[in-house]
């Protein structure tokens, strides 16, 4: 394992260019430097120290220096799992239910990103439990070196006592909540893509978590 220390400005710069959960440090830097994709195993970028400022207010970036761990990870298999295509009526049902949630008066007046985050996750699970379960267990959502969802609090606490796990209401799942609004949106996007939901819905939800 290799450890590097970066200052806050560099941390925020790298984090702002993350395009998916579990994206490797090599992937990010190669994209920023316009280098060709490497054919060798990459290393995953993982935060190992959650700063006191972010722990106190997870909706905003911290203002202290950050540490990253670079851990070697195995190359992805060239054989991707076959994803069962969801019937159109199932997708439409999920979209309608999620829109009911985000267009509700309670959601519109909610100011805490974590409450909105949990409300959307609950809606996704209740409309399609099987699809939700498959989506959150995928590498795209869980990442290569960090667990974001689990069936119990202990599993998430084992990954770090700072993760602030919360149970997703009316579901058997728990999720970490110590991240900022942008990271919450990346997690939601991964789940919704895994459930084969349309980009239009994802973009509408993005507006509640990321201000351009």
From Swiss-Prot:
Disulfide bonds: none annotated. One of its GO terms (cellular component) is cytoplasm. It holds the Pfam family SeqA. One of its GO terms (biological process) is negative regulation of DNA-templated DNA replication initiation. GO terms for molecular function: DNA binding. It is found in: Cytoplasm. The keyword Metal-binding does not apply. InterPro entries: Arc_rbn_hlx_hlx (IPR013321), Ribbon_hlx_hlx (IPR010985), SeqA (IPR005621), SeqA_DNA-bd_C (IPR026577), SeqA_DNA-bd_C_sf (IPR036835), SeqA_N (IPR033761). Keywords: Cytoplasm, DNA replication inhibitor, DNA-binding. Residues 113-114, 144-148 are annotated as: Interaction with DNA. HAMAP family: SeqA. Homodimer. Polymerizes to form helical filaments. Belongs to the SeqA family. Negative regulator of replication initiation, which contributes to regulation of DNA replication and ensures that replication initiation occurs exactly once per chromosome per cell cycle. Binds to pairs of hemimethylated GATC sequences in the oriC region, thus preventing assembly of replication proteins and re-initiation at newly replicated origins. Repression is relieved when the region becomes fully methylated. NCBIfam families: PRK11187.1. This is Negative modulator of initiation of replication. It comes from Actinobacillus succinogenes (strain ATCC 55618 / DSM 22257 / CCUG 43843 / 130Z). The gene is seqA.
